[in-house]
């Protein structure tokens, strides 16, 4: 049997695309050593400069490790965005494809031909897919593309306009995954709260929640990548009222200064953002994640200081911060740029603040009883079982280390009630109290 090595870079949306490719390459034996693979695939990210560099380095590194007569295939966002340039500049690569042909990857490899469809691939209920990284959790991609006009973001230029999956397609996929033992789901898209806007429906995500709740066997669900102008008060209240959807609110804000929100074309002012955030925060056991960009053109010291004070005071649970990346095909590309030195200085300042905020979020968990999912052996040592809080998204929100159990041996993928005993530098030490019925 021929061997396959696949490297998936970037976001969880890319991961789903990689899992689709794996589903269509099930005839291959997966291996974790590039030097032994007959086919090597890199699913690239082309979002910001650092991601582009990571993708190029990964391609060149795999070329150095590959064996003679193997096939190196490059796909994904970077390829879609820089197709002509990369095909000229990367003679190391054997086959190229973009973001439209994941279901045809087997055909492409068999025929040894490049494929570039004109439209972005949209998953259906019939898509073959092999879930990786968990036996209980899966990401569910509900749409592709984006209709927003953010000044810094090039995604619409290579992913295209919003294209939503039909609700029936998503429900069919969920039912299949539940039948296979999956019970924890994260719903994703470039802009999840605009789901079905392209079909003229403004409450599409609410209707999807209604339908998901009818499926027996789902233990938890959360929605990522809410957008400030498409996320309504009604949507937030519907999530809060749900017995299946966790009060997990992931809304990348990018800034809080009204001046910067206008320049960045975010569509909502700080008053509107704070109203929504306070509603989210009022929910029982709420968990708030966001992201910010520093150094975007037009950001003054006053804007940056306002952002820092807001980050200090609001009480987010998790925050990602990025230095502004100058990207072609964006409105900000031709604006007067903030000097790199200033951007780096601001990034260091806010990263320190963010670190302290996240530490407080972990610290407040001590003494709480939480539902957690066992995810496997911990890298911290043989005496710990790794787990995640049921509220959290997979991998990005933290790790719980269980080293005591009042309910015998712990099963992977099973839900337990745990008492959080200690915060160990953003990892929580816990004791398992009881097994929780998955139904």
From Swiss-Prot:
InterPro entries linked: Elp3/MiaA/NifB-like_rSAM (IPR006638), Methylthiotransferase (IPR005839), Methylthiotransferase_CS (IPR020612), Methylthiotransferase_N (IPR013848), Methylthiotransferase_N_sf (IPR038135), Ribosomal_uS12_MeSTrfase_RimO (IPR005840), rSAM (IPR007197), rSAM_horseshoe (IPR023404)
Subcellular localization(s) per the UniProt record: Cytoplasm
Species the sequence originates in: Campylobacter jejuni subsp. jejuni serotype O:2 (strain ATCC 700819 / NCTC 11168)
Keyword set includes Iron-sulfur: yes
The protein's name in its UniProt record: Ribosomal protein uS12 methylthiotransferase RimO
Binding site for [4Fe-4S] cluster 2: 146, 150, 153
MTTase N-terminal domain span: 2-114
NCBIfam families on file: 30S ribosomal protein S12 methylthiotransferase RimO, MiaB/RimO family radical SAM methylthiotransferase
Taxonomic superkingdom: Bacteria
Residues where [4Fe-4S] cluster 1 binds: 11, 45, 77
Residue ranges that the Swiss-Prot or TrEMBL entry lists as coiled coil: none
Pfam family, one: UPF0004
Catalytic activity: L-aspartate(89)-[ribosomal protein uS12]-hydrogen + (sulfur carrier)-SH + AH2 + 2 S-adenosyl-L-methionine = 3-methylsulfanyl-L-aspartate(89)-[ribosomal protein uS12]-hydrogen + (sulfur carrier)-H + 5'-deoxyadenosine + L-methionine + A + S-adenosyl-L-homocysteine + 2 H(+)
GO BP of this protein: tRNA modification
Any one GO molecular-function label of the UniProt entry: metal ion binding
Keyword Iron appears in the UniProt entry: yes
GO terms under cellular component: cytosol
Enzyme Commission code: 2.8.4.4
Top-level EC class as recorded in UniProt: transferase
Family: Belongs to the methylthiotransferase family. RimO subfamily.
